[in-house]
Each structure stands twice: as C-alpha cells, then as structure tokens.
Amino acid sequence: MPEYRSKTSTHGRNMAGARALWRATGMQDGDFQKPIIAIANSFTQFVPGHVHLKDLGQLVAREIERVGGVAKEFDTIAVDDGIAMGHDGMLYSLPSREIIADSVEYMVNAHCADALVCISNCDKITPGMLMAALRLNIPTVFVSGGPMEAGKTALAEHKLDLIDAMVIAADDSASDEKVAEFERSACPTCGSCSGMFTANSMNCLTEALGLSLPGNGTVVATHADREQLFLRAGRVAVELCHRWYGGEDPTALPRGIATFEAFENAMTLDIAMGGSTNTILHLLAAAQEGEVPFGMQDIDRLSKRVPQLCKVAPNTPKYHIEDVHRAGGIMAILGELARGGLLHTTAATVHARTLADAIAHWDVTQTVDENVHTFYKAGPAGIPTQIAFSQATRWDSLDTDRSEGCIRDVAHALSQEGGLAVLYGNIARDGCVVKTAGVDESIHVFEGTARVFESQDAAVKSILADEVKAGDVVVIRYEGPKGGPGMQEMLYPTSYLKSKGLGKQCALLTDGRFSGGTSGLSIGHASPEAAAGGAIGLVRDGDKILIDIPNRGINLLISDEALASRRAEQDAKGWKPVEVRPRKVTTALKAYALLATSADKGAVRDKALLDG
C-alpha cells in the first residue's frame, strides 16, 4: 500500500526537528499518524469572486479534523481579469495561471502533504489549481466560491452582468445617469461573474471532470447550501485519502478520475452549454499536465457531434448561472447528454463510483430524492452583499421544461452542433476557436476586409473613433502567449464593436484570447501566433478573409505563392510588431514568454526547452 507522503517529515528520529516545527503549528502526538491535507485557498480582497473566501478554508479545515485528518491552509494569488482588462495589467492574467500552479506544487511538495482541497473560483485560479492537481496526482477535491447573483435595475428589462456595464459605457446614446445605474447594479454580490463566462465555465467543467461535487459550478456564492459543499469537500478529501493510502484505489487520484474519457466529457459539456473559449485553452493545459493525449483535434471532432442544449449570458440576456441551477445544474445537462449517448458514463468521480451513478442520483428529472429537488431550488436573494452563505432563498419550483426551458434535451436542442468550434485554414494552420453560441446564424459564413492592428490598444482606439466599418475583419496580432506577452483578452474591442452597432456586421480575429463575456463573430487563439511565425502575422490591410463556420474553415484569400512571398519577407524582417508598443514588459513577463507555447498547446511551458 502507498504510505502517507507526510511520513517523510513526521516519522523517524532524524525528523525530530521537523516534528518540532509541526508541533509549533498546533500538531500533537496523535496527529502524526493522520493524513496531512493541504487546503489551497485563494482569498483576496482584489477579486469579487474571492472576497468571501477568507474564513472558508478554516471551515473546511475544521471538518477535515472532525473526520480524522490534519488540515493545513495556504493561499495563492488571484488576478481579477475584469479589473486588469484594458491596460497592461491584462499581460499578467494568463501567466498568473502558471504561477498559481507552481505555488500549489511548491507548497504541497515542500511539506509532503498527502491530499489537497482546492478552494478556487475565478478565471485563472481554477485552471491553475487544476494543472497543479494533475501534476501532483494526490487525492484532490475542488470546491469553488460560487457564482455571483445577476444584477437588476428598473432601467433594463433583463438581468444584468459585467458585460452590460461595459457595453453601455461605450454607447454614445446612453446618459451618464444610465451608465452609472448599470455600473452600480451589474455586480451586486460576491462571487464569480454571473454569466457563463470563464470562471463559471471552468467551475462547471470540474463537475464533468469528476473532481468536484454536484452544484459546485452553479449554487450562488451567497446561498447557505454552498456551506454544505465546503463541509462535504473536507469529508471527501479524507475519504479519498483512505481509498488511496488504505486501498490503493487509482480512482481516488486526479489522473485516475480526469482520464481521456473525462476530458471528453468535460469538453462535451462545454460545447453543449456554450462555455467560454478560454476553457479550451485551460483544458488543453490541464491535459498536458496530466499527460492525457487530449488535443485540438478531439475538440474539433466533438464540436461536430455535440448539440447545444443551453444558452446563457453573454449569449442571451434571458438566463444566467442561477437559472442553470434552477433547471438542475450541470448534472441535468450531463443527464441529457448521457441519454443522447454522448458521454462516457463509466468515468469515475470524487463523490460517486461512476458518472452514471452520479447522474442517477442528482439529475432532477430522474431522481426521486426530494433533497436533490430542494437543493436545486436554491436561488438568489437580490440583496447586495460580500458575505458567503448569507441567504437561504428558494425558487417555488424547478425549471424542468426540456423543450423550451433553460436546459434542453437533445430532441429540442438549440442547435445540432454545439456552442464551440475549431476552425482551420491558411491563416491558422494549427487551429483557432470561436464560440458559435454567441454568433448570429446570419454571419456563420462571413467574407470581410482585413483591418490589421498590432495591439489591442490600437484596435480599441480605431473602433471608438468609428474607423472600423461594417464588413471589416478586425485582425489583432502579436497578442499571443509570446507576442503579448500573456495572451490578453479582447473583451473591450468586442464590447465596443457591439456598442457601435457592429456586433453582427464585423468579425474579429486574434492570436490573443477572449473573455468568457465575449459574444459575436470573435475568433481567437490563432495558432501558431504571429510571434511564432503564424500566418496571422502575414495579413495586410485590405486583404479578404473568408470565415466559414459550417465547414470549419478560415482562410486568407490570396494565392499560396503570394503567401510564401510574404513569409520570406517577414522572415527577413523578424516576427515582431512594426512599431514599438507603449507597454512595459517586465522580467517576469519575459520569462513567461520565453517558454510559452501557442494556444493550441494550452499556452503551457514548452517542456522541450526545459528538458533539452
């Protein structure tokens, strides 16, 4: 049987010094026979999705201790993409994912922890911790801080979120008073932003991967029911320890749970619910860490067979994550996918032996357990707060309408192809991605004129100056992992196109990425990126670009000979922006750029450079 890793520092005469230090943290004689479970918290006062996490690590710790473990908490960093967006702060967002993964690895391995509870929530924190969990491969369970409640105002007919505040701010017809009202109303509570943006998408995907508990992605942060998720996560961590160290059960480990089949399940869910394109980047990165052979070709294959069963903000103003929960949450979507023959239901989870068992118990349309029905009635209270578990509001009824409700069955799918697609062509040899859930069907095939910019800032300036016209393809390059560096999100350009009335009349192509709040014909992750010699670096103003989503194509409409000639010319000049950009690239960012791969590899470090 495997021995507790912690014995390295808790057993033997020569470890007297280490035990003395452990005792100084509060451990006593009887504790040295117990598993030491690390709690990776991510509390910070900078991020609304994390402001309420301060005491929650200790909540989990006390539960771990109650059921026979020793808990030791530490914190990671957390960057708020919305606050960092639109300026050089966004250069740090994606690189922070690697720092988070490294910091969890450093703490867990330095102290020989036996298991791990990951308390995450927002955009790069869940992916960073997921990468670390698959790297470490010790018993691990995820529990997130939960989604924010959607905002409300008398000035809008629909519920609000962050994107509404951003779009109206750039709408010249909106009064200052209306902008201020949207700003005050869009983000009313603690939690991750209320739509199917990156944070919520990733927290939902941990349910499909099998690494978190039902409801992890959908119970609002303010609801009392989420407290039980935290307590149960502590108990599950101890149970996983017993299964691995006491029974050598491989399905107690992240790599025994998050297998190739589980990654396919997660991507199937992502496509079905029209999640953020960032999830592709993060799933690819996690797969690399777990040595799972899951790649862009698998995503492309799945995107052609998985229907879209759910459409949530920003793809529609009608539904937010709180509405997904009322409809049965992620387990309900997984249930519909399973009945459509689209899932690997023998995959393991941290809370059930198989996904099939989990669905049987947690799918609101199938279970007879009234406790499950009550759980999924947990709803928003509409009271602004930064306090977790501060309300216990419940809907009067569940949304189980699978023909016209928030979650559809396969027979009533919103579209027969899902909400994400991978496009290939001479402009993106290794692929690029588009959230088709947010694209109007009238522009699924779009031919436009290239307007080339070598920074997000230049593109924003041009859009706000009304220099971008209907029929243009805005090309923003040298914003990839190396070229940015840091692969900035392009939420401001897409939001401003929408506010200028060009959301259905223009396209945007970039080697950068998009916020989960992006909608419209926004194509990102062009690989290889310009800084790595990608053909997006060869596009010129006035070129014609054809985007063909149904046929998964994206091409620069020039001859192969002309493209080769441009490549030779660019090789001679070097693959870098023509003009020096007014951004400060620090040593930390340069170190990230030196090792970063393009988006088709998840923008992870190029291990060949390290191993070589």
From Swiss-Prot:
Binds 1 [2Fe-2S] cluster per subunit. This cluster acts as a Lewis acid cofactor. GO terms for biological process: isoleucine biosynthetic process; L-valine biosynthetic process. Its EC number is 4.2.1.9. GO terms for cellular component: cytosol. [2Fe-2S] cluster binds at residues 122, 193. Pathway: Amino-acid biosynthesis; L-isoleucine biosynthesis; L-isoleucine from 2-oxobutanoate: step 3/4; Amino-acid biosynthesis; L-valine biosynthesis; L-valine from pyruvate: step 3/4. The modification N6-carboxylysine is found at residue 124. It catalyses: (2R)-2,3-dihydroxy-3-methylbutanoate = 3-methyl-2-oxobutanoate + H2O; (2R,3R)-2,3-dihydroxy-3-methylpentanoate = (S)-3-methyl-2-oxopentanoate + H2O. The active site is at 515 (proton acceptor). It holds the Pfam family ILV_EDD_C. GO terms for molecular function: 2 iron, 2 sulfur cluster binding; dihydroxy-acid dehydratase activity; magnesium ion binding. It comes from the Bacteria. Keywords: 2Fe-2S, Amino-acid biosynthesis, Branched-chain amino acid biosynthesis, Iron, Iron-sulfur, Lyase, Magnesium, Metal-binding. Its cofactor is [2Fe-2S] cluster; Mg(2+). Homodimer. Functions in the biosynthesis of branched-chain amino acids. Catalyzes the dehydration of (2R,3R)-2,3-dihydroxy-3-methylpentanoate (2,3-dihydroxy-3-methylvalerate) into 2-oxo-3-methylpentanoate (2-oxo-3-methylvalerate) and of (2R)-2,3-dihydroxy-3-methylbutanoate (2,3-dihydroxyisovalerate) into 2-oxo-3-methylbutanoate (2-oxoisovalerate), the penultimate precursor to L-isoleucine and L-valine, respectively. NCBIfam families: ilvD, PRK12448.1. Belongs to the IlvD/Edd family. This is Dihydroxy-acid dehydratase.
